[in-house]
Amino acid sequence: LASNSGAANPLWMAEWLTSALDLQRGMRVLDLGCGRAASSIFLHREFGVQVWATDLWFSAAENGQRIRDAGVEDSVFPVHADARSLPFSDEFFDVIVSLDSFSYYGTDDLYLNYLARFVKPGGAIGIAGAGLMQEIDSFIPKHLGDWWTNDLWCLHSASWWRRHWERTQIMDIEIADTMPDGCQLWLDWHRLIAPDNEAEIKALEADRGEYLGYVRLVGRRLTNATLPDQILSVPTQYIKKPLLRSEP
């Protein structure tokens, strides 16, 4: 499993997140930022759902081979796509899940407006992954200083994510919480998959769950939610006009 993971343990995240979801056989599920598709294979085997294993960084061809080797190619479909440019029709999915990848794109104030159109009204969107137990509002805590880089400002607390989604008035938030002993599990997994990353390991050892851990959020698209139109281009017609008053 370690060789098939690009970040947090995908099965830990999938088990934790799905315990807060009502997945039924035959549902269509988007696994957004699926990495090497281990979570997608798990979702089908465990719940009998159809899964679109979608990722930008990892090869769809490689994921396709992994899916075939698992014998689930009739129900798990590898897709190479950017989370901001998804090749699906509106209201195609019953459920959308994102495991340890949503922070890379979901902090955008406009992103939920975009993503929610792909799930049916009443359908659920759930995320789980690395986050903060409390927000870091000013200076980086000293014990995290050697590890922290500017890209880690995408990490947030469960309460931050709740507010981020609630204010759109698109989702009814059903759960926003943290994983018990999440920091220790993060540390244990990182020691296995990246033992040479001493900066992160030392940060986790020193933190002991004060700031670092795993967060989870599940919301359901409101049936009366109004999604703004997605503007892909502005139609225009060129009419030649002088740029300066002195021009004919």
Language model segments and positions:
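A short acidic, Gly/Pro-enriched loop at the edge of an enzyme's catalytic core
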Residues: R84-V95
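Short, glycine-/aromatic-enriched active-site segment of Class I SAM-dependent methyltransferases
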Residues: A130-L152
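Class I SAM-dependent methyltransferase SAM/SAH-binding core
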Residues: L30, R36-S85
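Short alpha-helix
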Residues: W153-Q169
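Conserved Class I S-adenosyl-L-methionine
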Residues: E174-P248
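Conserved alpha-helix/loop element of class I SAM-dependent methyltransferases that forms part
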Residues: A8-R25
